[in-house]
UniProtKB/Swiss-Prot annotation:
Function: Catalyzes preferentially the transfer of L-fucose, from a guanosine diphosphate-beta-L-fucose, to the N-acetyl-beta-D-glucosamine (GlcNAc) of an N-acetyllactosamine unit (type 2 chain) of an oligosaccharide, or a glycoprotein- and a glycolipid-linked N-acetyllactosamine unit via an alpha (1,3) linkage and participates in the surface expression of VIM-2, Lewis X/SSEA-1 and sialyl Lewis X antigens. Preferentially transfers fucose to the GlcNAc of an internal N-acetyllactosamine unit of a poly-N-acetyllactosamine chain acceptor substrate.
Expression (tissue specificity): Liver, colon and testis and trace amounts in T-cells and brain.
Gene: FUT5
GO molecular function, one term: fucosyltransferase activity
Glycosylation sites: N60, N105, N167, N198
Location(s), subcellular: Golgi apparatus, Golgi stack membrane
Cytoplasmic side: 1-15
Pathway: Protein modification; protein glycosylation
Organism phylogeny: Eukaryota, Metazoa, Chordata, Craniata, Vertebrata
Protein known as: 4-galactosyl-N-acetylglucosaminide 3-alpha-L-fucosyltransferase FUT5
Organism the protein comes from: Homo sapiens
Topology term for the membrane: Single-pass type II membrane protein
Family named by the database record: Belongs to the glycosyltransferase 10 family.
Lumenal compartment segments: 35-374
Length: 374
C-alpha cells in the first residue's frame, strides 16, 4: 500500500478550499469597485464643501438645448476665489438651472484650492491690488482660472496686470468664453402670454433711477437737455427717495423709463433695461451702445433709442405724442405676446461656467484681457 494514499483526499480538500476563498476575494473586490464607481457618478459632494442648495424655477436663458437624458460628466470642483462684491449668494444645483449640465461642486472655501478643477475670480474684488489678491501663481496641473466681470471696461482697473494668468473669460460680452448677459428674452411656454397692460395704472410719464450721479457724464448731460422739454422724475441719491423694496411698485406707474448706461461699450446693456424698465412694464428709452447692438438681443419695437432723434427736444416731443396715442404706445408691447424677459443671477453665471468646463476640456491661455475687454 502506498504510504501517501490516506493523505491524498485531505490535500485535495485544502486545494478546493483555497480556490473558493480566492474566488470570494475577487468577487468582494469587484463589487466594491462597482459601488465606488456608482457613488462617483452620482456627483456626491466632496467632504468639507459648502452644501449646495437647489434653486428652483424655469429654464433660464442657457443656449444649450434640452435633452431627454443628461450625459455623464465628471463632478467638477469649482472654487469661487471671492464672493461677488464680498456678498455670499445661494449656490445652485446646476442640473436644475442649465439643461444638459451635470452638477458641479461649487464652494467659496479657499482651502480646496489645491484640489479645485477651476477657480472663478471676480475682477472687482481683486482689481485694486491684483498681485496680492490673485490666487497663488503655482497652480495644480490642469486647473483653469476664469476671469469674471459684469462691469464695463470703464470700471475695471489694472486689467494689464492679468496678462497670461487666465484660461477663460466670463462676462456680459457675447464674445466671452462664457456669456452671462444681464438679461435675455425667451419664448413663453403657454398661452395666454400675459395679462393685458393696465393703462389706467400708468399715471406718470418718465422716470429715471440713478445712484452714480456724475454731472459731466454723457447720460447726465442728455438728461439735463431732455428735462428742459419734458418732466422726468429722478430717483436716487440727492433726488427723490426710493425706499428699498419699492422700486418695481414705483416704476410700474410710469410709461417710460430712461435706461441710460453709465458707460458706452459693446453689449453693455444692463439691469437698467432688463429689470428697471422691462420688469416694471415701462418702455425703455435707451442710451448705450448702438441700436443695432440692442437689436441683437431685443425686437426693434421693444425700446426707443436716443440715437433715433436729432435732439433731446425731438425725443421729448415723441414721448408726449405716444402719451396721447394709446394704440402707438401699446405697439411697444406686442413682442410680449410671444416673449418674456429674464434677468441675470449669480447662481446662473456659476452654472454656465460649470457647463462650459464640462463641455470643453481644452486648455488655453488668455494672453491679454486688457487688449480684448475694451
Amino acid at each position: 500500500m502506498d504510504p501517501l494514499g490516506p493523505a491524498k483526499p485531505q490535500w485535495l480538500w485544502r486545494r478546493c478550499l483555497a480556490g473558493l476563498l480566492f474566488q470570494l476575494l475577487v468577487a468582494v473586490c469587484f463589487f466594491s469597485y462597482l459601488r465606488v464607481s456608482r457613488d462617483d457618478a452620482t456627483g456626491s459632494p466632496r467632504p468639507g464643501l459648502m452644501a449646495v442648495e437647489p434653486v428652483t424655477g424655469a429654464p433660464n436663458g442657457s443656449r444649450c438645448q434640452d435633452s431627454m437624458a443628461t450625459p455623464a460628466h465628471p463632478t467638477l470642483l469649482i472654487l469661487l476665489w471671492t464672493w461677488p462684491f464680498n456678498t455670499p449668494v445661494a449656490l445652485p444645483r446646476c442640473s436644475e438651472m442649465v439643461p444638459g449640465a451635470a452638477d458641479c461642486n461649487i464652494t467659496a472655501d479657499s482651502s480646496v484650492y489645491p484640489q479645485a478643477d477651476a477657480v472663478i475670480v471676480h475682477h472687482w474684488d481683486i482689481m485694486y491690488n491684483p498681485s496680492a489678491n490673485l490666487p497663488p501663481p503655482t497652480r495644480p496641473q490642469g486647473q483653469r482660472w476664469i476671469w469674471f466681470s459684469m462691469e464695463s471696461p470703464s470700471n475695471c482697473r489694472h486689467l494689464e496686470a492679468l496678462d497670461g494668468y487666465f484660461n477663460l473669460t466670463m462676462s456680459y460680452r457675447s464674445d466671452s468664453d462664457i456669456f452671462t448677459p444681464y438679461g435675455w428674452l425667451e419664448p413663453w411656454s403657454g398661452q395666454p402670454a400675459h395679462p393685458p397692460l393696465n393703462l389706467s395704472a400708468k399715471t406718470e410719464l418718465v422716470a429715471w433711477a440713478v445712484s452714480n450721479w456724475k454731472p459731466d457724464s454723457a447720460r447726465v448731460r442728455y438728461y439735463q437737455s431732455l428735462q428742459a422739454h419734458l418732466k422726468v422724475d429722478v430717483y436716487g441719491r440727492s433726488h427723490k427717495p426710493l425706499p428699498k423694496g419699492t422700486m418695481m411698485e414705483t416704476l410700474s406707474r410710469y410709461k417710460f423709463y430712461l435706461a441710460f448706461e453709465n458707460s458706452l461699450h459693446p453689449d453693455y446693456i444692463t439691469e437698467k433695461l432688463w429689470r428697471n424698465a422691462l420688469e416694471a412694464w415701462a418702455v425703455p428709452v435707451v442710451l448705450g451702445p448702438s441700436r443695432s447692438n440692442y437689436e441683437r438681443f431685443l425686437p426693434p419695437d421693444a425700446f426707443i433709442h436716443v440715437d433715433d432723434f436729432q435732439s433731446p427736444k425731438d425725443l421729448a416731443r415723441y414721448l408726449q405724442e405716444l402719451d396721447k396715442d394709446h394704440a402707438r404706445y401699446l405697439s411697444y408691447f406686442h413682442w410680449r405676446e410671444t416673449l418674456r424677459p429674464r434677468s441675470f443671477s449669480w447662481a446662473l453665471a456659476f452654472c454656465k461656467a460649470c457647463w462650459k468646463l464640462q463641455q470643453e476640456s481644452r486648455y488655453q491661455t488668455v494672453r491679454s484681457i486688457a487688449a480684448w475687454f475694451t
